[in-house]
Structure formats: C-alpha cells, structure tokens
UniProtKB/Swiss-Prot annotation:
Record's keyword annotation contains Transmembrane helix: yes
Membrane disposition: Multi-pass membrane protein
Intracellular or extracellular location(s): Cell membrane
Name under which the protein is recorded: UPF0756 membrane protein Moth_0120
UniProt keyword Membrane present: yes
InterPro entries noted in UniProt: UPF0756_TM (IPR007382)
Transmembrane segments: 6-26, 52-72, 75-95, 111-131
Superkingdom of origin organism: Bacteria
Family: Belongs to the UPF0756 family.
Entry GO CC: plasma membrane
Organismal lineage: Bacteria, Bacillati, Bacillota, Clostridia, Moorellales
C-alpha cells in the first residue's frame, strides 16, 4: 500500500470521526480513482475541482434569490441597516481569509491533516461545526502572517 493511499485512508477516517462529510467524501473519491487506476485525472481535478466546487457552492447560495424567496426589499435592507453592513464587511473579510487559506493549503498541503484533527477536536470538545478547510486555512494563514510579523 502506497503512502498516498495510507494518507487518503487516514483523511477519510479523520473526516468521518470529525463529522466532516466533505473531507471524508473527497478522500473516498480519490481512493476510488486510485483503486480503479484513474489517477490520470488527478491533474484535471487539481486544476478544476475547486472551481467546480465553488460554482456549486455559489449556486446553492443563490437559489433563494432565483426562487423568489428573498424579496428585493430584503436585499436593499442589507445596504442600509447596521446588521446588513456588518454582514457585507464580514463577507469581504471571510472571502479574503478563504483566499489566503487556499494559497496556504496549496503551498503546504500537509497542513490539511492538522486542520482536520483540529476540526475533530473542535467538534468533539467545543461543540463546533466543521465548515471546511478554507476557513481553517484562512485562520491558519492569518496566524502564520501574525507570527511572521511579530518576529
């Protein structure tokens, strides 16, 4: 059994233990590709899977607008109310942090294991909800930049 297979099995098990279905499913999918000798698709997935995933994420967020469940008046409230302005600022900060997290994970993919373990600890002992590696990566990137700045 290759080291890559062991790592994917470990990630899948950690995802299951940490109740992170996304990590468990992604690791299982890659294991399936590996066991069926379809690794030739890895470069395509590496280039395009994140983009495809983000499209599905944005589609799921836009469905309430497309279905008419969010009225134009409600949308305008987000531009003139304090909670709405805070939500806009939070979205800007979160997306910037997610971008930093993605860049960090692309440079240091080995950090994923630590983030998954941290998610498991957060769920098991602090009542957390595993939301995915980008936000954890964003926070890690912020802390890495802070440590570099403090040196």
């Amino acid at each position: 059994m290759s080291a890559a297979t062991v790592i994917l099995i470990l990630l899948m098990l950690l995802g299951i233990l940490g109740r992170s279905n996304v990590i468990a499913a992604a690791a299982a999918f890659l294991l399936l590709l590996q066991f069926t000798s379809l690794q030739r698709f890895y470069p395509i997935l590496e280039r395009r899977a994140l983009e495809a995933g983000l499209i599905f994420l944005v589609v799921s967020v836009l469905v309430p607008f497309a279905s008419g469940r969010v009225a134009p008046r409600d949308m305008l409230q987000s531009f003139v109310s304090l909670p709405g302005l805070i939500a806009i600022a939070s979205g800007i900060i979160a997306t910037h942090m997610n971008c930093q997290g993605l860049e960090l994970l692309q440079r240091f993919p080995q950090m994923m294991i630590g983030m998954v373990i941290g998610s498991i600890i957060g769920v098991a002992f602090f009542g957390g909800i595993p939301v995915g590696p980008l936000m954890a990566g964003g926070i890690a990137a912020l802390l890495v930049h802070l440590m570099a700045w403090l040196r």
